[in-house]
């Protein structure tokens, strides 16, 4: 339902027609509970963005607050993918019990080429406006002027801040749909039951992956890229603990272009591989 809300209310073609967006629910610690079948690279990395908001707003977060970020160093992917995060408060609780998040590919966030993905960029500033843990809504009030000012800042500001703001409002609405449905579920079944079932979902997912791991074998692989770099990965399986270590030692260092994968994207790729095996 969050995804349909976002698709129906978004402004940009990327979200409305190309469906380059994702929505998900997270527990109080920022761990994934459930997601729609959207973009794997979003869903495997969004939790790191949630954890950034939790960590950097501990003790100051309030009901009605909504946060926004696209920072690749804090769970983001590339700068056009903007994440909106809404804490979910229940009753008189002083801390959020859940979080809902939506990530959408905006048509432009600045940078030295339209679309904000210049292949010849050598600095992240050349790709557009970088946003980390910015309060988009404060106690229910949209900080529109502050957001427009941020989108118009930096060396290469957004080319269409009004369109960005329209898509951000759609993401806020999608999140609010998730908040409403969570509250309805808690009202119907009780918080203890809802949290118990959420833990069961997480435990079941973990057990499913551990079963897959026991069928895997150690291996090492190298892929040469056409720019002279290489990706090297090794998997080491510990059958006793039913766990695996994925080691990228030997992979080429960061390149002086925009074809680099931040940590969250690497994690998302690994998680997606395990998902396909379950």
Residue ranges and their predicted role:
Residues 252-278:
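Alpha-helical support elements that line or immediately flank enzyme active sites
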Residues 95-157, 254-255, 264, 268:
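Gly/Pro-rich active-site capping loops and adjacent beta-alpha segments
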Residues 40-53, 107-116:
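A short, polar/charged loop-to-alpha-helix boundary motif
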Residues 1-18, 54-58, 68-77:
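Short, basic/aromatic recognition patches
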Residues 130-206:
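N-terminal leader/propeptide and maturation segments of large enzyme subunits in energy/redox metabolism
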Residues 83-91, 101, 237:
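A short, hydrophobic, proline-anchored segment that marks a local hinge/packing element in signaling
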